[in-house]
A protein has these predicted regions:
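N-terminal accessory/pre-domain segments preceding catalytic cores
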Residues: 1-26
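Conserved active-site and cofactor/substrate-binding residues in soluble primary-metabolism enzymes
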Residues: 43, 47, 84-87, 134
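Active-site pocket-lining segment
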Residues: 59-79
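Short basic, glycine-rich beta-strand/loop surfaces that mediate nucleic-acid
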Residues: 2-6, 74-84, 97-147
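N-terminal intrinsically disordered, cationic/polar leader segments
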Residues: 14, 50-54, 58-59, 77-82
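A generic structural motif
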Residues: 35-39, 85, 130
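Glycine- and Gly-Pro-enriched alpha-helical subdomains that act as flexible
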Residues: 19-62
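Short amphipathic alpha-helices within nucleic acid-binding modules
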Residues: 87-96
């Protein structure tokens, strides 16, 4: 048996699911990581946290209505993906900019985890969204899901 406050959280989440009708357009957020950096699981999690948060903060300014809708449907879906290298990550960043989709490059600094993290600034990830799945599919289809 769950405590009443926890049950209330589950019930509230269930009520937001009623918004998912046939006309519903899926809103997602994405974190795309550089596969060539071989980040540890802990490092990936930290960079993903930065990616989702910074993209969301940018979206609050760029697209407040969509961001509010994302928040109102239980914070939507978050998807983590790999880009092969920095070039692929920059391509996604530029494509999002061109389409006015909120995005933010994540730049790690001051951490030393050799060989890639030497203490100098390094681009590790890209945060995107919230964005409608159908408006961003032409960008995200190039990347692979994290396993």
């Amino acid at each position: 048996m769950l405590d009443a406050d926890i049950q209330a959280m589950l019930d509230q989440r269930k009520s937001t699911m009623s918004a998912f009708t046939a006309e519903h357009r899926a809103l997602n957020m994405y974190a795309i990581f550089r596969a060539d950096l071989d980040m540890t699981p802990g490092k990936l999690c930290a960079q993903g946290g930065h990616a989702f948060l910074q993209a969301y903060e940018k979206a609050l300014i760029q697209r407040p209505e969509i961001t509010s809708h994302y928040k109102g449907t239980g914070n939507g879906t978050k998807i983590s993906m790999y880009a092969k290298n920095l070039g692929q990550l920059i391509r996604a960043y530029r494509d999002c900019q061109k389409d006015s989709i909120p995005c933010e490059l994540i730049i790690d600094r001051s951490h030393i985890i050799l060989p890639h993290f030497t203490g100098n600034p390094i681009i590790t990830a890209l945060g995107i969204g919230p964005a409608y799945k159908d408006e961003i599919a032409h960008i995200t289809r190039r990347y692979t899901l994290l396993k």
